[in-house]
């Protein structure tokens, strides 16, 4: 509502996060642009992978730092299995359910093949959503066919991302400022910074789940300790097979 705001630069430094969190932020950027007609520029820092790139695709222009790692277009679902650990310490879990699939994903037993099929279908659905979101944001730069070829979950350097049309240019924060000025038809402007503190409970979407991984400058060791079962647009190589 402040008429003095003529452009927004979003600095991204994140490996990604939960599917829903990523989609909410992406949608908020689109809604902001539609309501205000104010241009939004994405400035990728060290990491802008998976959910971070999902968010960037909502912006009018994407700039990556020369050392940025981005990409990781895909979905990961995490279901820990601690059955053998409990067996070693003599603990058994007795679970009563109303149906065979009610405790799907339980960490207290091995996952059944039919459960894997259910979760794989969900992962595939979220992956198609990811592809469509990126395509809608980048369709003037890349076709869906080319996007599908490079969206296999791998990460890219800034130079590779530029070659694949996932970003618009490589530069520094001054490049983002120059682009924001150009998109808003200004020759100069005052730059004001806003910082988001993750534990703030002041927004519409704030819930107790904020104590779990979200988008921001997370400590990955802490993230591993708090990662709950679910579906993520997240690059987390520590969970490698």
Where are these regions (language model features)?
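Catalytic cores of alpha/beta
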Residues: 52
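Flexible, glycine/proline-enriched loop segments at strand-loop-helix junctions
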Residues: 71-73
């Amino acid at each position: 509502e402040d008429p003095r705001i003529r452009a927004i630069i979003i600095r991204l430094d994140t490996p990604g996060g939960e599917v829903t969190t990523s989609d909410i932020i992406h949608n908020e950027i689109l809604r902001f642009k539609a309501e205000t007609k104010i241009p939004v520029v994405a400035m990728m820092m060290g990491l802008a992978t998976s959910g971070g790139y999902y968010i960037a695709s909502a912006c009018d222009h994407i700039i990556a730092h020369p050392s940025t790692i981005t990409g990781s277009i895909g979905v990961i679902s995490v279901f820990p299995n601690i059955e053998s650990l409990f067996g070693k310490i003599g603990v058994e879990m007795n679970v009563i359910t109303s149906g065979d699939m009610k405790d799907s994903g339980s960490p207290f037993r091995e996952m059944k093949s039919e459960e894997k099929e259910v979760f794989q279908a969900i992962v595939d659905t979220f992956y198609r959503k990811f592809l469509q979101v990126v395509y809608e944001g980048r369709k003037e730069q890349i076709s869906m066919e080319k996007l599908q070829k490079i969206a296999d979950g791998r990460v890219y350097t800034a130079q590779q991302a530029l070659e694949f049309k996932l970003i618009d240019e490589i530069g520094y924060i001054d490049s983002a400022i120059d682009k924001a000025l150009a998109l808003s038809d200004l020759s100069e402007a005052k730059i004001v910074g806003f910082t988001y503190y993750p534990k703030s409970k002041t927004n519409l979407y704030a819930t107790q789940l904020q104590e779990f991984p979200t988008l921001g400058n997370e400590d990955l060791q802490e993230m591993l300790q708090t990662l709950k079962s679910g579906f993520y647009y997240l690059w987390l190589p520590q969970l490698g097979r």
